[in-house]
Amino acid sequence: MRSWVLLSLVLAGCAPTVAETRQADARQAKSDAKLARALQGLTPGPAQTCLSSIDRRNARIETYGSTTLYRVGRDRVFRNDMNGGCGTNTIDPIYVTQTPSTQLCRGDIAQLIDRASRFPIGSCAYGDFVPYTRAR
């Protein structure tokens, strides 16, 4: 009986507080609003499984929570919704990816490295790459 009480106290200490949940929700809403502004005026196309190395090398990379945008010029953006533990609204990690080919493809793993400590802090898998283009 005593161990059950102790276990319930330990588990209760691990649960997020109401304030922490509200802060996380506010950060997510802010990130979603920034993402919507970044894609404003762009039209999504059919999803692609891979992003060529040419597009990737010429891209400016922006992250919004678990979504990564590869901005190739003014009129073309590739959106990737990462799977796994890449939803970071509080830190700006370094993404390290080792690919078996010259393309970055769905299912490739990205390891997250903390900029300050240079220690690994997580990993996740890339999803489909959705091209967004500006209507002319």
Where are these regions (language model features)?
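A residue-level signal for beta-strand positions that form part of recognition/binding surfaces
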Residues: 8, 77, 123-126
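Sec-dependent signal peptide recognition
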Residues: 1-7
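C-terminal motif of bacterial Sec signal peptides marking the signal peptidase cleavage site
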Residues: 11-13
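N-terminal secretory signal peptides
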Residues: 16-79
